[in-house]
A protein has these predicted regions:
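Short hydrophobic membrane-inserting helices
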Residues: 1-74, 81, 99, 103-151, ...
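Amphipathic alpha-helical "stem/stalk" segments
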Residues: 81-375
């Protein structure tokens, strides 16, 4: 409708200008003819007529120019309207395309989280997936999509990926030089920081050594600190791949016994702030076995040789959560306690009463008797 009205308007302008020019010419030449009279043979008269004719054609050309300019102005206005409409349509198409890409990007991210859960036997789930996506890609919205994300480790502007990087770096440095670092509280704090950043909710069966923080079970087990760091590194590497960054540096040396022993010592007999952080030990007598394990380290070499079979077995047990799970087997633990009782009896027989080693061995022997009675 608007196009039709515009077309009629321009044709009306052309017709008005044309009729005006023709009418003006008729009136002009009629008046000139009346005043000039019969055809004159005078040069001045024809000169005046030529000037008149020239002036008329100038007016006619001016009218044509004005009409052309009006037409071009109208055409330009129509082109601008068309361009604006096309731009609006293009913007709408781009917005729809960007939104679709955003939705697909989020879906692929969620699918990757499912793959990570399956990779580790569905022992955990990511607690808040939407919040996790927004932390990994803080600039992404339905109207803006970025496939890469920076890893900012500077304390003043640190982002989520930068925080994960720093948590893992601290633990890598610990693994490189664990000697002399017997501060279990420090290690617990670093591991909990990493656990909280990942925001995982455990859905597997409770195991001996699982750590609870603020009433929620974490993916950390005090008998398998390395296993937790391995899971955390795999998750971080997945984020790095998805955001177009390099993977994390690998743990060249595992934290191993140093980490497990530090965590066990820290929680052994610890009772302060149980509502904040505590270790789940549903197996009866587990703490007593831990105490025997550490007491054996204080026995002098001359007597330790008799206890070595017991110590080696306990060291293997406390090296991983799987090892501790063996203690649920009644036959296995009965054999362990019998081995311990026999080794301790040999060491006691060769130790002088009242000696430091004798007293330590006596405590170990009594603890073993209590454990045997429990079974």
């Amino acid at each position: 409708m608007a196009k039709s009205e515009g077309r009629w308007w321009i044709w009306g302008a052309w017709l008005t200008i044309g009729v005006g020019v023709v009418g003006f010419g008729i009136v002009l030449f009629t008046l000139y003819g009346i005043n000039l009279g019969p055809i004159s043979h005078e040069h001045a008269a024809w000169s005046s007529f030529g000037s008149l004719l020239s002036g008329f054609f100038m007016v006619a050309s001016t009218g044509a120019t004005v009409a052309t300019l009006l037409f071009l102005a109208h055409q330009n206005k129509q082109i601008q309207k068309t361009n604006i409409e096309q731009q609006r349509v293009t913007n709408a198409q781009l917005a729809a395309m960007n939104f679709e890409q955003y939705v697909n990007h989020r879906r692929f991210f969620m699918e990757r989280l499912n793959e990570l859960q399956s990779m580790f036997g569905n022992t955990f789930v990511f607690e808040n997936r939407d919040a996790l996506y927004n932390k990994v890609f803080p600039k992404n919205t339905p109207t803006n999509l970025e496939f890469k994300a920076e890893v900012v480790t500077d304390p003043g502007s640190q982002n989520y990926l930068g925080a994960l990087n720093l948590h893992l770096s601290v633990l890598r440095n610990y693994a490189k030089s664990p000697s002399g670092k017997d501060d279990g509280r420090w290690l617990v704090g670093k591991l909990i920081n990493l656990s909280e950043a990942l925001d995982l909710r455990m859905v597997n069966e409770v195991a001996e050594g699982d750590l609870e923080f603020k009433g929620q079970r974490t993916p950390l087990n005090i008998y398998g600190a390395d296993e937790f760091v391995m899971v955390a590194t795999a998750i971080y590497d997945s984020f790095m791949f998805y955001t177009g960054n390099d993977k994390a540096e690998r743990l060249i040396f595992p934290m191993g016994r140093s980490a497990n022993d530090s965590l066990m010592k820290y929680f052994l007999g610890r009772e302060e702030y149980p509502e904040i952080v505590k270790v789940l030990k549903p197996l009866p007598g587990l703490e007593m076995l831990e105490r025997i394990y550490f007491d054996l380290c204080g026995i002098e070499t001359e007597h330790f040789g008799y206890l070595e079979p017991l110590y080696a077995q306990l060291m293997e047990i406390f090296s991983s959560p799987t090892g501790v799970q063996k203690l649920r087997n009644n036959v296995y633990i009965a054999d362990l306690l019998e081995t311990g009782r026999r080794c301790t009896a040999k060491a006691l027989a060769r130790s002088e009463k009242g000696a430091d080693d004798y007293n330590k061995l006596k405590v170990i022997s009594e603890d073993l008797d209590i454990l045997i009675a429990l079974k």
